[in-house]
A protein has these predicted regions:
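Catalytic-core region of carbohydrate-active enzymes that cleave or remodel glycosidic bonds
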Residues: 254-275, 298-350, 361
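Proline-centered turn/helix-capping motifs that create local helix->coil transitions or kinks
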Residues: 36-37, 99-109, 151-152, 193-197, ...
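C-terminal beta-rich recognition modules with glycine/proline-rich loops and embedded aromatic residues
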Residues: 201, 265, 331-339, 344-442, ...
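Solvent-exposed loop and edge beta-strand segments that line ligand/cofactor-binding
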Residues: 48-66, 82, 118-133, 165-178, ...
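Extended ligand-binding groove/face enriched in aromatic
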Residues: 48-61, 77-176, 183-215, 223-225
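Low-complexity, Ser/Thr/Pro/Gly-enriched N-terminal "stalk/linker" regions
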Residues: 1-65, 91-112
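Beta-strand-rich binding/interaction modules
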Residues: 448-468
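Well-ordered alpha-helical scaffold segments within catalytic/enzyme domains
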Residues: 16-18, 68-84, 134-148, 181-193, ...
Length: 623
């Protein structure tokens, strides 16, 4: 499948547009203030003026948080409603980078700092120098495309050229401890046409898996450096690293057509979706090493599901869609977007989750903390703040992932109020998705030749309807004709609440059900249930009978659940030293009484008082 032609897409209303407005109004100004407070700018400034003070921060890769923010700003500062102070911040950082860059092109505020014990390129396993470069390149390409500002691109190319000279085909065979530069180098090739960057990206993909990083404090599997990429049997290791590496490999395939890469990517993707991805689209089940677990190892309350891993999964999904045209990749993209990604940001746009569990215990506040199950509620910033600026840049770019045009076909994959132009065809998309399942396309301008409009039918939409009548092929509803201004294409998706079961191998949720409506996963917070959430018993029938109600501009689900009696806490007491050798003989559990319960979209949980939460609820049994 070809890359496709250029298209112009703008969000004009609805939930995603509201998220972008919040990003401009609240999240970006908040991030700028936090970056200033944390010392990210001062770390660059002190390279020219050591009197500024010592290096600020614990990690050697903090420049990346500036780069990700700059990438988001490249999309925002040119808008009429640009965030306050955004342009001044953008210009200030670019000027600092110009001043800080070494004569040979190297740029890293930590390793250039004369007070640091490590020298450039001395710690590729943990120094993240190429990872930083990757985010610099992505910011530079965005600025060149969106702002016609080539200053960052000049900086990025100087650094990238140094890497090609040092680690190219005739250079030292190394890889970075954190994949990211691979997809950035491919994007730099697309922007400049310089094939050296594409060659370098392919080299980095091909070199991984040769044990280059085994000497570090983490095993090779953590870095995906234990097995060559094409031979990986399963997604493994650090979740963000894994998905970034796969996205980079997908980019290399897109430009080279390497079938061995695509075969590996499809195998790894299918394994991940079938056995290692949470219902929310979250990736990474272990707090230890922020890692992907074994097949079906998907604990709810200990889920790590890092917000950055959600973004990396969307990056991989988008590239797989572009490589194959298959709707299943956008199904996962959409699930991640509305759940595992969106939950990472508070409703007011100024606080963040790093990890995203599917359950919180009632007593969690007594033991909360990053080293013991993650944060209870979102935080304003982090010592390693990779997630907040990642959220910002992805939010700024959402319109670029609504559709793709190729071979006179407009593929509309993510639904939102928007206006899209491609191949002389302009359509206005009107919808209240994901709250409502009706998507209406009105043709505003059309060429005299035949065109095809393909609308994605999500896998959960078993009774979708399209008018005028078209064919449904491999997850797409397709209408082909010579369109004229005023023509309307309408897709209707079923939006009844659904009860989801779980694979029996997932011990952590066996015998439980979860609730979804459209692409949204729902959960119950303790403040919305008249009984302890751990004692609620839910049946599929109760889910199907749920009432949909608007609350604070979102749709919630009201339903009735039964309550276990005796409560689980009484039925299964904590075993003490006096009872360890005694068999537990308790009266049989029964269900008694019914209580009203309100389920809220998972992405909204944690915005109120810190109480218990569950996605997976115990199944009502026959008594």
């Amino acid at each position: 499948m070809s890359h496709g032609t250029e298209l112009d897409a703008q969000l004009t209303g609805g939930l995603l547009h509201g998220w972008q407005e919040r990003n401009r109004r609240a999240t970006i100004p908040h991030a700028i203030a936090e970056l200033r407070k944390a010392g990210n700018l001062e770390n660059l400034r002190r390279l020219a003026d050591p009197s500024v003070g010592p290096y600020r921060g614990r990690y050697p890769f903090l420049d990346t948080d500036l780069y990700k923010t700059l990438e988001g700003l490249a999309y925002e500062v040119g808008r009429d409603d640009a965030p306050a102070g955004a342009r001044a911040f953008y210009d200030e950082v670019v000027e600092l980078l110009e001043q800080a860059q070494a004569e040979d092109g190297y740029l890293n505020s930590y390793f250039q700092d004369p007070d640091q014990p490590k020298q450039p390129w001395s710690d590729l396993g943990w120094g993240h120098e190429l990872y930083n470069l990757g985010h610099l390149i992505q910011a530079a390409v965005a600025a060149n495309r969106r702002l016609s500002d080539g200053r960052l691109l000049t900086i990025a190319r100087r650094f990238a050229d140094l890497v090609v000279r040092t680690y190219g085909a005739d250079g030292e065979e190394v890889v970075d401890g954190h994949p990211e530069v691979e997809m950035a180098l491919v994007e730099l090739y697309r922007e400049t046409g310089d094939e050296d960057y594409l060659t370098q990206a392919r080299l980095f993909v091909d070199r991984r898996g040769r044990g280059k990083l085994e000497h570090t404090i983490f095993p090779g599997e953590y870095f995906q450096d234990h097995v060559p990429f094409r031979e990986l049997p399963s997604v493994t290791g650090h979740a963000v690293r894994m998905a970034y590496l796969a996205a980079g490999a997908a980019d290399v395939h897109l430009e080279t057509g390497d079938p061995t890469l695509l075969a590996a990517l499809e195998r790894l993707w299918d394994d991940m979706v079938a056995t290692k991805l949470y219902l929310t689209g979250g990736l990474g089940s272990r707090h230890s090493d922020e890692a992907i677990g074994d097949r079906y190892e998907l604990p709810s309350e200990r889920a790590y599901a890092e917000t950055c891993a959600a973004i990396a999964t969307m990056q991989w999904a988008w590239r797989m869609f572009r490589a194959t045209g298959r709707a299943k990749y956008l199904d996962v993209y959409e699930t991640v977007l509305y759940n595992a990604y969106a939950v990472g940001l508070s409703a007011d746009g100024t606080a963040f989750f790093y990890d995203n569990p599917l359950q919180r215990r009632p007593d969690h506040e007594q033991r909360s903390g990053a080293e013991d199950g993650g944060e209870l509620l979102r935080r304003a910033w982090f010592g390693c703040p990779c997630c907040p600026p990642n959220i910002i840049r992805w939010m700024s770019e959402l319109q670029d992932h609504l559709a793709v045009a190729r071979d006179n076909v407009l593929y509309l994959g993510i639904y939102a109020d928007a206006r899209i132009t491609a191949n002389d065809l302009t359509v206005k998309v009107s919808t209240n998705y994901p709250w409502d399942g009706e998507i209406t396309l009105t043709v505003e301008n059309a060429p005299p030749e035949e065109r095809t409009i393909a609308l994605r039918v999500p896998a959960w939409a078993t009774e979708a309807n399209i008018t005028p009548a078209g064919e449904q092929v491999d997850g797409w509803a397709v209408v082909r004709r010579t369109f004229a201004a005023g023509d309307v294409v309408r897709l209707t998706l079923p939006m009844a609440p659904r009860a989801h079961g779980v694979h029996p191998y997932v011990d952590a949720a066996r015998g439980a059900i979860a609730v979804a409506r459209g692409p949204l996963v729902y959960c119950v917070e303790q403040q919305d249930a008249a009984a302890p959430v751990d004692d609620l018993l839910l049946s599929p029938a109760a889910v199907h009978a749920a009432t949909v109600r608007e609350q604070d501009e979102h749709l919630v689900l009201d339903l009735t659940a039964k309550v276990a009696h005796p409560p689980a806490a009484e039925l299964y007491p904590v075993i003490s030293e006096q009872t360890t050798q005694q068999p537990i003989q308790q009266p049989a559990e029964s269900a008694v009484g019914e209580v009203p319960v309100t389920l809220v979209p998972y992405f909204l949980w944690g915005n109120r008082q810190a109480l218990a939460m569950r996605v997976w609820l115990r199944t009502e049994r026959e008594y």
